[in-house]
Amino acid sequence: RVYAQHRQALFGVALRMLGRQEDAEDAVQTTLIRLYRSIGNYRSEARLGSYLMRILINVCYDMLNARKRRTEIESAPAEEIHPPGPDLRLQLEEAILALPERMRACFVLFAVEGYPQQDIADLLEVRIGTVKAQIFQAKERLRDLLTDPPDMRTT
């Protein structure tokens, strides 16, 4: 029942955080396993959806860090793996994936999933000012990435 109720929201966030369907599915499954293992730590006054989202964000961070370590070992630049395409939606997805992890989490939870900023602050265990700044900076970076021609971008 928990899976059916929260799967779509968890998968959407995981996909936008990780960029790959297979990784997103793995993240959701890992989240549910971690929930099962840590159910004793769950405080009933907290919403289960928020608790699951916090676990998912941590799982995504873990997966991104592992991916970063593998990429460093393989020495493969991300630009060669995912070249930007002509489709604006694809460009937006790629631009979101290029954001730093915390900034990406704040932006995805706010702009894509519709979470209030205070809930995001609670989920990520940061101050609301940090969330607001991260969302603002994400919008600025995305605007720059999507309006500048690719050959004019500085990296």
Region roles according to the model:
Residues 106-110:
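A short pre-motif secondary-structure segment
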Residues 1, 11-30, 128, 150-151, ...:
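Short, charged helix-capping/linker segments at alpha-helix termini
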